[in-house]
Each structure stands twice: as structure tokens, then as C-alpha cells.
């Protein structure tokens, strides 16, 4: 089959990409949403979401499934479809995936982030055998008194610690500083439950035989290394941008590899927009949703040149 023509190709089906697809189609743009893995991005592996308006508390997977259901009423959504190549030919983008080739007028990149690794001995060896980056996926194996450590000090680490505690795991949080940077509400919940925190501490090595059975932890203040018996290690120390597509298109990025955008989500390349965690800053669902809608509306303005865009230009030139 020949190339598929679209107005807009959106890459990444997290909250930003799904919102962009809804807004794009509602604005009248022929849109396709491509996702190389499963729907939902980081939210899909978040045990509980408590700060998304309209839901006091909702499992992340449930929230993204609801978003996906709504998105599929408007836009084509292709899962397990990965962008392999993308190039600009005159005023169109040729997007090659493992399944098809698309020719599009505009591109929205909502490719998100992936988990940062500890980069310590034993981490890779025991991945899936005690080392995890997803409490929602793997927490069940450590219920009923199993000893686990959660490494990190942000919202994700605190959420993991609380979730594992509710499963009945014996949880210790390991943080390299003497202050957590997570929300106050999460700190209070951890204190209330008596979750132990090892301050000013880092994991030096993950030990085990067939599975994890211990970790070496260094106290940075005391300069002491001690071995602690554990069954599991959950890593939550931040994220790295999924910027492969941005690199292919030669987009301007910041020092950490996040895509630079203006307030309308436009990138350094005309007709290419970015939204969600890939733009850096505050990694929150509400922000991703907001940026997704703005990216789609900017794409609509640039592709369709509606009368109000011309009026705006006139006002600005006066």
C-alpha cells in the first residue's frame, strides 16, 4: 500500500498525545496517533492519582483507559507502532513506522520520558528479579512483609513507598539528601505510616544470587557503607527524555535533552509541536493535557490559517 495522507501525525499516546488527538480531530484535522508501546505513558504505571481534578483518587491505569476510550471516539490510535524514520520533504513530513508510511502537514511530539537508572553494579543483572521501576506492575510480588527499598525523594518515590506499604511490604525509602522534594501531603502520609527514610544515602551495589537479597548503601555524611537485606529495589530517581524523533528532525533541545517550545508549543522547526513531559518542566497530568490541547490548536491555526489567525497578524503588525 502507498503512503497514508494525514493533516497531523501525533507521536506518543500519553495524556498529552491523546488530548492533542481529540482536539485535532474536533478542529477538523485528519489525525493519527502513533504509540510504540501501550497507551498511557508514565500515568499507566502510577498506582494512584490524587491530584487530577474531578477524581479524588483513581488508579493511573483506569484514568488513561478512560482517556483512551474517549480518544478512540475521535481519532485513529495505533498501538505498537514505532516511528523509525522521519524527514521533511518540501512542505510535508514523511513518517515511516514499522507498519506504514504517513505524509503529514504537521507533527506533534508527545513521546514522554523513561525512567532514569541508578547505574550501579547488579541493577541490570537483577532487573525483573527484584529490581523494578514500576511499583504498580511489580509491587504484588513483595506483599506480606517482604523487605523493599524505594530509591528517590520525589512524588513518584513517595507514591511507590505508600503503595508498597498498603500491599503489606516492609518499606524503607533511600534518599541522597536530607529533605524530600515530594508534595507535603505525601510526606505527611509517609510519616503517619512510619515509613523509614535513610537520609543522605545512596545505593552502591545490588546483591543477590538468582534474585535480589541485599543492597550496599553508603551514608554520604558518615562515609560508611553497610549491607542491608532486602527482597526488592524500586528505583524512582527521575526521568530521561524520549527524544529520538526530536533528534531525527533536528529540533532545538535544552541541556537535558528536552524539546524547547514557545507558549503555543511550537518547536524550532515550523509545523512541528511538542507537548507533555518531553518539553521538560513540571511533569504533571494536568500540564500534559493542557500542552496537548494547545499543540493541536496551534497546529490547526498553522495548517488551516483560519480568519482569526490573519486578524491576529494584522493586530500584531499595527
Task: Pin down the residues of each PLM region.
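Beta1-alpha1 glycine-rich phosphate/pyrophosphate-binding loop at the start
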Residues: 3-74, 156-183, 198
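FAD-site-proximal beta/loop scaffold in flavoenzymes
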Residues: 1-3, 119, 125-142, 237-287, ...
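Glycine/small-residue-rich loop that forms an oxyanion/phosphate-binding "nest" at active or ligand-binding sites
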Residues: 78-142, 153
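Nucleotide donor/acceptor-binding cores
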Residues: 6, 29, 105-106, 129, ...
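A Rossmann-like FAD-binding core segment of flavoenzymes
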Residues: 71-97, 101-104, 166-263, 303-318
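Phosphate-coordination loops involved in phosphoryl transfer and adenosine-cofactor binding
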Residues: 5-7, 80, 144-146, 200, ...
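Conserved phosphate-binding and hydrolysis motifs of nucleotide-dependent enzymes
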Residues: 12-17, 112, 152-154, 276
Amino acid at each position: 500500500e502507498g503512503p497514508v495522507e494525514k493533516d497531523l501525525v501525533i507521536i506518543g499516546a500519553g495524556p498529552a498525545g491523546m488530548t492533542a488527538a481529540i482536539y485535532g480531530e474536533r478542529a477538523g484535522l485528519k489525525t493519527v496517533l502513533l504509540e510504540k508501546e501501550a497507551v498511557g505513558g508514565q500515568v499507566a504505571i502510577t498506582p494512584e492519582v490524587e491530584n487530577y481534578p474531578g477524581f479524588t483518587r483513581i488508579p493511573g491505569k483506569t484514568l488513561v483507559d478512560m482517556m483512551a476510550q474517549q480518544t478512540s471516539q475521535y481519532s485513529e490510535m495505533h498501538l505498537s507502532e514505532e516511528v523509525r524514520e522521519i524527514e521533511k520533504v518540501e512542505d510535508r513530513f514523511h513518517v515511516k513506522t514499522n507498519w506504514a508510511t504517513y505524509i503529514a502537514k504537521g507533527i506533534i511530539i508527545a513521546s514522554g520520558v523513561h525512567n532514569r537508572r541508578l547505574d550501579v553494579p547488579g541493577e541490570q543483572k537483577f532487573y525483573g528479579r527484584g529490581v523494578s521501576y514500576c511499583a504498580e506492575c511489580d509491587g504484588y510480588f513483595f506483599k506480606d512483609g517482604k523487605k523493599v527499598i524505594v530509591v528517590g525523594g520525589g512524588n513518584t518515590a513517595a507514591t511507590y513507598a505508600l503503595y508498597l506499604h498498603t500491599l503489606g511490604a516492609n518499606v524503607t525509602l533511600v534518599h541522597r539528601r536530607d529533605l524530600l522534594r515530594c508534595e507535603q501531603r505525601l510526606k505527611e502520609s509517609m510519616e503517619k505510616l512510619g515509613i523509614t527514610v535513610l537520609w543522605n544515602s545512596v545505593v552502591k551495589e545490588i546483591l543477590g544470587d538468582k534474585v535480589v537479597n541485599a543492597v550496599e548503601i553508603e551514608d554520604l555524611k558518615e562515609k560508611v557503607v553497610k549491607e542491608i537485606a532486602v527482597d526488592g529495589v524500586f528505583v524512582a530517581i527521575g526521568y530521561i527524555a524520549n527524544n529520538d524523533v526530536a533528534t531525527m528532525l533536528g529540533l532545538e533541545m535544552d541541556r537535558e535533552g528536552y524539546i524547547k517550545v514557545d507558549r503555543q508549543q511550537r518547536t524550532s522547526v515550523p509545523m512541528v509541536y511538542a507537548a507533555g513531559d518531553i518539553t521538560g518542566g513540571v511533569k504533571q497530568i494536568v500540564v500534559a493535557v493542557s500542552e496537548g490541547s494547545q499543540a493541536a490548536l496551534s497546529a490547526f491555526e498553522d495548517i488551516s490559517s483560519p480568519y482569526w489567525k490573519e486578524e491576529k497578524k494584522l493586530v500584531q503588525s499595527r
